Amino acid sequence: MRDVCLPFLARENLSNPESGLILLEDTERSHSSLRIGQNAPDGVWPLGNSPILPVVTPWPLCQDHAAPSIWTLLDAYWRGYQDQNLEPPKWLWLCLEDPSGNKYTGTQFLVPPLGLVKIRLYQNLTVVYICQSIDPWENENPTGGRRDPTRRYGCRIACDPVYCVKIVWEGNLWDKKDQPCWLIRLKEGHNHGAKELSQRDIKILGESRPYPYGLIGQCPKLQYAIQVKMRVDKAPLTAKVLAVKALHFHRWNICQRENPGIGEGYFPSGYTQALKAYGPQHGSAEQRVWLISTKIVGPQEKDYWRDAYRWGYFPLVPNKHHPGWTRHLTKFKISRFATPADIQKIVDELLPRGASIVTADGNRYESTRKVHLVNEGTLEEYQAKIRK
């Protein structure tokens, strides 16, 4: 293993062999490895000049230093129990040794709707594993493992490179300077994930606390647990494209003053507009043209798509039973998981000030937009067109 690590050390300019061994762990189940941050080879604009970790998460994490990200995760863990008026269990930190022989201090905990988080603190490295497929309340397969509790956990929303990641910062929590960061996306069946849990384990996790989510259309936690994860997974795109899309997801949310920033573990008011900023789930020809024109990706198809033809995403012969999906951009639609804040923002975007809509459940939303577009008429003209 150390012989394999030497070329990797030279290529990535790592400080010690231990760093290479930790980065190379579980390479068979990794989708890609991206070195990001300032002065990093993969840190092109806009990834290089943003402190946000380009991964779809409920709240933004930090790519420039491990401490804000660890704080966000622990803060979200504590807030989750506080919102349910529960006493958080004490964190159990253990001194362990990884398969490569390096010692670390580690812990793990479940943060709904993010999933299972594992933290490893090495002498000169900080490693965080995030498996967002683990959710014993909303991502359980009711038909799997009923007769055999020892059977492997079968979930509806499987592990995916879009949201299952391993993050490595070169440095410890007390370093004052910015740290190089590696973002390793993990495929289904990765270590430290859902494949290591049985149905009995999931049952124990589900019974460890009350149901942590609210009602459909009212709770952003539930919206992220179901809509966001199902809306971003199974994307046949390269690592850099996934990173740029995740960055757009966070940038929209973080620009709203009521939403959390880096180092804050509370939930935003909703995710509908962030998903709109994220763009099409499987990519599109229009988005590829824009990324090429802004020189974020190269001109070749392999710079944008990844294994698209291998998995038959674009069928050559139309088949109504297996239609696949189109390369081109489609209209964005809101779902039943959209929160009232989401609907209000959409009304403000689409309707002139004073116009309103009434939803199926009888709630009325009136546009409060202060900007009047040139191609729009007054409210009276808008109502006259409707009557006509």
Curated annotation (Swiss-Prot):
InterPro entries: Foamy_BEL. GO terms for biological process: positive regulation of DNA-templated transcription; viral process. It comes from the Viruses. Belongs to the spumavirus protein Bel-2 family. Bel-2 expression is low. This is Protein Bel-2. It comes from Simian foamy virus type 3 (strain LK3). The lineage of its organism: Viruses, Riboviria, Pararnavirae, Artverviricota, Revtraviricetes. The gene is bel2.
